[in-house]
């Protein structure tokens, strides 16, 4: 009886380590911005994230043009240049400083799709889903760590 109880406690503790931040928890529609742009999904509650393309402060709100990527278990966007789920625009009341929310920072939004907006990407007309964001979650910058491996000081392999 003690072993299963200990195993259960360890499982619960380990699961707590990989949880989502509280503002990003909840039930959300499972489709991507690309899928939303192909059909009308107005009113759906979504949790999308990705990398910032540009930030547009307006008189009463701030809009973010985003490249969407898949979200991990913690709702943080994966960082992969070729893994895109389309683009979207997320707007939130208030001022968000473009110096802090700079290009390529990772952000996760929750909110409701309020409509669609046509914008140009180069010469291409792109249909952006527009999200009225309830939560704007800016993730910390990922630190790059250079791992340096040095050869062993002895001429044979192994630790002995």
Annotated model-derived regions:
Residues 17-160:
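OB-fold and OB-like single-stranded nucleic-acid-recognition modules
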Residues 1-17:
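Sec-dependent bacterial lipoprotein signal peptides
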């Amino acid at each position: 009886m003690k072993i299963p109880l200990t195993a259960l406690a360890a499982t619960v503790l380990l699961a707590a380590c990989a949880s989502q931040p509280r503002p990003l928890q909840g039930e959300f529609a499972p489709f991507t911005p690309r899928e939303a742009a192909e059909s009308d999904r107005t009113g759906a509650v979504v949790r999308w994230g990705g990398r910032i393309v540009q930030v547009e402060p307006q008189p009463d709100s701030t809009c973010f043009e985003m490249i969407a990527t898949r979200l991990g278990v913690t709702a943080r966007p994966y960082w992969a240049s070729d893994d895109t789920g389309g683009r979207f625009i997320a707007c939130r009341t208030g001022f968000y400083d473009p110096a802090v929310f700079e290009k390529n920072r990772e952000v996760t939004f929750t909110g409701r799709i309020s409509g669609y907006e046509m914008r140009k990407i180069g010469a291409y007309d792109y249909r952006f889903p527009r999200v009225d964001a309830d939560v704007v979650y800016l993730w910390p910058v990922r630190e790059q760590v250079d791992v340096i491996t040095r050869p062993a000081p002895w001429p044979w392999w192994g630790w002995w």
